Each structure stands twice: as structure tokens, then as C-alpha cells.
């Protein structure tokens, strides 16, 4: 059985970052708030900053301390576009098309991981599995010699009383 407490202890010793592309969804905001309170993963929310703060306020969660990134104002967008064009060069990617694609939070978030800016990404609350996995396959790909991809869904249900 997985020892969740040991995992949390390891994360607290060496905190990591997690990109959350669906930054305005109340469930994602709740998760970010819990991560901040638990002090073991630093959430990076993607979305228009005002919209993320408004959603957090409406949902009643404190996300102070979370980083919020907006694709349209990201300071390293030119570098990101260049790298994305290099990765997708065989598919005829242009800078104009890359800028449009990178407005999508799943593509933007995946490029943040590819560029080494952050450690991990978790998505799929508002988007389908394919919309979440496709950017990872196109940008990061699979391990050499491995062509199998899998996803995982975790469900938490209340304990019976």
C-alpha cells in the first residue's frame, strides 16, 4: 500500500512545483489552497490573473502565495515560442501558429515543464484526457523505446461514519 505520509514528508524536505492549467476552476483553486496550507507543493495556476483571484474569492479559498501565470503576459513567451517551433519544426510550425497554440493552458503549461521552469503538471478537471495528454505527447514525448502512454484518475470519497 502507498504510504502517503512518507511521500508528503519527502516533498516537505524538497518542495516541488506543480502547474495547474485550469486555474479558474473552483476545484483546482481548492486544491491549490490545500497545497499551500500543507506546504509541500507550490502551485502555479494558469489563467488571467484577475479571473483566478475572482474565482478564488467566489469559492472562498485563500491562494495567497500561489504563483499565477497568464500566457498573454508571460515574460519568456518569445523563448517559449522559439522552443515550441523547434520541437514542432517537422510539422511546419510557424511562430504565428505557435503563439496561438500556446494560448491554450495545457500547451502553455506543458512547455513550462519542457523548459524546466517547473517540476510537474496536473490537469484534466475542465478538459478531456486527450486535451491534457496531447500537448505532453507533442512537446515532451515518450521515453525512447517506449510508445505506451497511460493516465491515472484519483477519486476521493468521504469516509463512512
Name every feature range the model reports, one short phrase each.
Residues 1-161:
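Anion-binding alpha/beta catalytic cores of soluble intermediary-metabolism enzymes, centered on
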Amino acid at each position: 500500500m502507498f504510504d502517503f505520509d512518507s511521500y508528503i514528508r519527502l516533498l516537505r524536505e524538497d518542495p516541488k512545483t506543480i502547474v495547474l492549467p485550469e486555474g479558474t476552476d473552483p476545484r483546482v483553486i481548492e486544491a491549490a489552497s490545500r497545497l499551500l496550507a500543507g506546504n509541500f507543493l507550490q502551485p502555479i495556476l494558469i489563467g488571467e490573473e484577475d479571473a483566478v483571484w475572482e474565482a478564488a474569492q467566489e469559492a472562498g479559498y485563500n491562494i495567497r502565495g500561489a504563483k499565477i501565470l497568464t500566457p498573454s503576459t508571460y515574460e519568456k513567451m518569445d523563448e517559449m515560442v522559439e522552443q515550441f517551433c523547434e520541437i514542432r519544426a517537422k510539422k511546419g510550425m510557424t511562430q504565428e501558429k505557435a503563439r496561438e497554440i500556446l494560448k491554450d493552458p495545457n500547451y502553455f503549461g506543458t512547455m513550462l515543464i519542457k523548459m524546466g521552469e517547473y517540476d510537474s503538471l496536473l490537469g484534466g478537471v475542465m478538459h478531456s484526457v486527450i486535451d491534457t495528454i496531447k500537448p505532453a505527447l507533442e512537446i515532451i514525448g515518450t521515453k525512447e523505446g517506449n510508445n505506451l502512454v497511460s493516465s491515472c484518475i484519483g477519486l476521493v470519497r468521504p469516509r463512512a461514519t
